[in-house]
Amino acid sequence: MAAKIKKGDRVVILSGKDKGKHGEVTQALPQEGKVIVSGINIITRHRKPSQANPQGGLDRMEAPIAASKVAIEDPKTGKATRVRFDVRDGKKVRIAVKSGETING
């Protein structure tokens, strides 16, 4: 199946604690149906002290979020939109449904 959301895309979070926030996809995990978005779904991991890290402490990191919970940001309006595919000049391109604009990538 074609990838509607790719690395580098601007997306809008549709549900959850970060609903309404915008971010950029830093990693797409198509096998799991998830994406990692910069600054979204931040989790805290408690690290025990070890020889490599004698202090231990808290690590904050971005966790994957379900791809169904994000939507591509329309390049024209900045709002969430669905994506369709079209062939233009012999190349398959992604098109924002709301505005008809071509999505880069």
Swiss-Prot record:
Record organism: Zymomonas mobilis subsp. mobilis (strain ATCC 31821 / ZM4 / CP4)
rRNA-binding among keywords: yes
Biological-process GO terms, alphabetical: translation
Domain of life: Bacteria
One GO cellular component term noted in the UniProt record for this chain: ribosome
Protein's name in the database: Large ribosomal subunit protein uL24
Keyword rRNA-binding annotated: yes
Gene3D superfamilies referenced in this protein's UniProt entry, alphabetically: 2.30.30.30
Entry's Gene Ontology molecular function annotations: rRNA binding; structural constituent of ribosome
Subunit structure, interactors included: Part of the 50S ribosomal subunit.
Entry function: One of two assembly initiator proteins, it binds directly to the 5'-end of the 23S rRNA, where it nucleates assembly of the 50S subunit.
InterPro entries on file: KOW, Rib_uL2_dom2, Ribosomal_uL24, Ribosomal_uL24_CS, Ribosomal_uL24_KOW, Translation_prot_SH3-like_sf
CDD domains: KOW_RPL26 (cd06089)
Gene name for this UniProt entry: rplX
UniProt keyword list: Ribonucleoprotein, Ribosomal protein, RNA-binding, rRNA-binding
Family note: Belongs to the universal ribosomal protein uL24 family.
